[in-house]
A protein has these predicted regions:
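Formylglycine-dependent sulfatase
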Residues: 12, 23-448, 452, 459-480, ...
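Glycine/proline-rich low-complexity spacer/linker segments in large multi-domain proteins
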Residues: 497-502
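Bacterial N-terminal signal peptides
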Residues: 8-20
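N-terminal secretory signal peptides that target proteins for export/translocation
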Residues: 1-5
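Short polybasic amphipathic segments
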Residues: 148-154, 454, 553-556, 604
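Compositionally biased, intrinsically disordered low-complexity regions
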Residues: 12-14, 311, 550, 607
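Acidic, low-complexity Ser/Thr/Gly/Pro-rich repeat segments typical of extracellular/periplasmic
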Residues: 514-614
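Surface-exposed loop and edge beta-strand positions of immunoglobulin-like domains
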Residues: 71, 455, 586-589
């Protein structure tokens, strides 16, 4: 298949619906609610123990999707939602030759409004050609109590962060205000509510956090297993799938010292509190619509932007992060990320299902009669929402405007309302050297530019049985389609390179974020079978400078003992690695079998190419 054929296969959905002269007799209101870094299993309706009665109500009175996919990253999903195509296809978020969804809905007579986190590329949400009303912030994260410098009400910078302010409440308040204005003016509305919850910083009221303290002392494995069992009871997952086990990046609960378990319980309690308070805000949105008599004829779509985030944090600072105080940055760890994404593999930033699987709840009483509480197994994706909303609202895509790129999604409105089968187009996934191509029921996926894997998503959506060796031709065909489409949309640089044969362990992406000149480590990061007698080695793309590093240590710890390093080193300019590209220590003590270790490096312990401090 040549490049143009590949692109045409992805664009088929837009040809299908745009050619039909659909005209709605009425224009229902639309609310899209986007959570930030919410895992697949966090909501009660998806197996979670967090108290989310309002979202559970929407699911129980509407339709929940079990095979909805987003993209691996906040910003790439947000662009895909607004553009109706992948982030790279939309000019890496530039929207070149792209007509954003709100702008098109405006042309169709809708009042378009947004409250929350933008982080969706180069288009400015303050532009009245995008949103008639806007309140929120532009970047990727914010302090939920005192904000940041990128908060705006329309074009006016917002600085009114008074004591008691919190982002979730503010976004809910603004959404209610904006919807009230539209109802008063008797115009249909598109309301985009993009909560920053539960992205870090995990900030919530003390009384909400306290409600969850102690609930997570059973540990990662027990909480995840309980979620998985509830998912089976709900019918969300296939019992034939093997739940993905955790890797070395997840510290084993039974090895953690008691003090660390208490900290980990508190970290997840903070996360649960943030989700809980978001659900409370959504409850207020529902109550407003009910009181206004608009709930039955309003389509509400709730979704997350990617799978659960991973962040082991720092043993030096985690206990000091107070969720109910400003200027703190509480996070949740890799272990809780594994829990959030149950039963799937990996986390945010990958192209495996742990990053892509997300909740999608559709609530529309007047349009979903007979579907109350149903689970829809259609493999819909975030790029399908744009064409679905066009068909719902009767707004036509300007198919004769040849300057515009075609949408790559396909409307699932008929499947939603009539329960007809959904014919999914091929899916192109990407983020920072990780990539995937999904076609029919098969998925080729690569992590960090490593070898392609192949999975049957019907039999093995948890990605535990790699078929690449057994089916090399199919693996090669799907990989070639990914490469051809990447070329068609003009991807360049390392993100579009042909994959290699070396597989970096989980977390390599984050290591390179903090040390971009890092080439490799020995033992490899997240290594399952490190040799018992070993050395510690870090290789860089430029020379290492150890001058001025005295008193800055590298330390090796057992997971079970955070107080006493099993090895530490304070290298200086006399070390043999000075001026070389490899920092090597051959005095590491013998490692114990079946034991987890990690390395901590003091800031400024060495520099790379003089200017790059690590």
């Amino acid at each position: 298949m040549n490049c143009k054929q590949v692109f045409a296969s992805l664009a088929l959905g837009s040809v299908f619906y745009a050619g039909a002269l659909f005209a709605a007799t009425t224009q229902p209101n639309v609310i899209v609610i986007l959570a930030d870094d919410l895992g697949y299993s966090d909501l009660g309706a998806y197996g979670g123990e967090i108290e989310t009665p309002n979202l559970d109500r929407l699911a129980n009175q509407g339709v929940r999707y079990s095979q909805f996919r987003v993209t691996p990253m906040c910003s790439t999903t947000r662009v895909a939602l607004m553009a109706g195509m992948s982030y790279p296809a939309a000019g890496n978020g530039s929207y070149k030759n792209v007509l954003p969804l709100p702008s098109l809905l405006q042309r169709g007579g809708y009042r378009t409004m947004m409250a929350g986190k933008w982080h969706a590329g180069a288009r400015d949400p303050r532009d009245r050609k995008m949103f008639d009303r806007f309140f929120g912030f532009l970047g990727g994260l914010t302090d939920c109590f005192v904000g940041s410098n990128d908060w705006y009400t329309g074009q006016t910078q917002f600085r009114d962060f008074k004591p008691g302010f919190d982002a979730t409440t503010a976004f809910t308040d603004s959404s209610i205000e904006f919807m009230g204005e539209a109802l008063e003016d008797n115009v249909p509305f598109f309301m985009y509510v993009a909560y920053n919850a539960p992205h870090h910083p995990l900030q919530a009221r003390k009384e909400t956090v306290d409600k969850y303290i102690g609930r997570y002392m059973d540990g990662y494995e027990a909480v995840r297993e309980a979620r998985y069992q509830r998912q089976l009871e709900l019918g969300l997952v296939d019992p034939a799938w093997t739940p993905a086990p955790h890797g070395v990046e997840v510290r084993r609960w039974n090895e953690l010292p008691q003090a660390r378990k208490v900290v980990e319980d508190a970290r997840m309690a903070a996360y649960a509190a943030v989700v809980d308070e978001m659900d409370q805000g959504i409850g207020r949105l529902i109550a407003f619509l009910e009181e206004a008599g608009e709930l039955d004829d309003t389509l509400i779509l709730f979704m997350s932007d990617n799978g659960g985030d991973y962040n082991n944090g720092s043993i030096r600072t985690d206990a000091d992060q107070i969720p109910w105080k400003p200027h703190n940055n509480p996070t949740s760890s890799n272990g809780w990320a594994w829990v959030k994404n149950a039963p799937f593999n990996f986390y945010k930033h990958a192209c495996h299902e742990g990053a892509l699987a997300a909740p999608l709840i559709a609530h529309w009483p007047n349009g979903l009669e007979g579907r109350t509480g149903q689970i829809d197994r259609s493999p819909v994706a975030v790029t399908d929402i744009y064409p679905t909303l066009l068909e719902l609202t009767g707004v036509n895509f300007p198919k004769n405007d040849t300057s515009l790129k075609p949408l790559t999604g396909r409307s699932f409105l008929e499947g939603l309302t009539e329960q007809t089968a959904f014919d999914a187009p091929s899916r192109f996934l990407w983020f920072n050297q990780s990539r995937a191509w999904i076609e029919d029921d098969m998925k080729a996926v690569s992590l960090y530019g490593g070898p392609w894997q192949l999975f049957d998503l019907v039999k093995d959506r948890t990605e535990q049985h790699d078929l690449a060796e057994a089916q090399p031709k199919l693996t090669s065909d799907l990989a070639s389609k990914w490469q051809a489409y990447a070329h068609e949309i003009e991807m360049s640089g390392r993100d579009s390179r042909v994959v290699g044969q070396q597989q970096a362990g989980w977390g390599w992406h984050r290591l390179q974020m903090f040390a971009p000149q890092l080439v490799s480590t020995f033992p490899a990061n997240s290594k399952l079978t490190a040799p018992g007698t070993t050395r510690l080695e870090m290789r860089f793309s430029a020379a290492i400078d150890l001058r001025g590093a005295k008193g800055k240590f590298l330390r090796l710890f057992k997971v079970s003992d955070e107080q006493n390093p099993v090895w530490e080193m304070d290298p200086d300019a006399s070390h043999p690695s000075q001026g070389k590209r490899t920092l090597c220590f051959d005095n590491i003590p013998a490692l114990e079998p079946d034991t987890q270790y990690y390395v901590l490096v003091d800031p400024g312990a060495f520099k790379v190419a003089v200017s790059q401090s690590v």
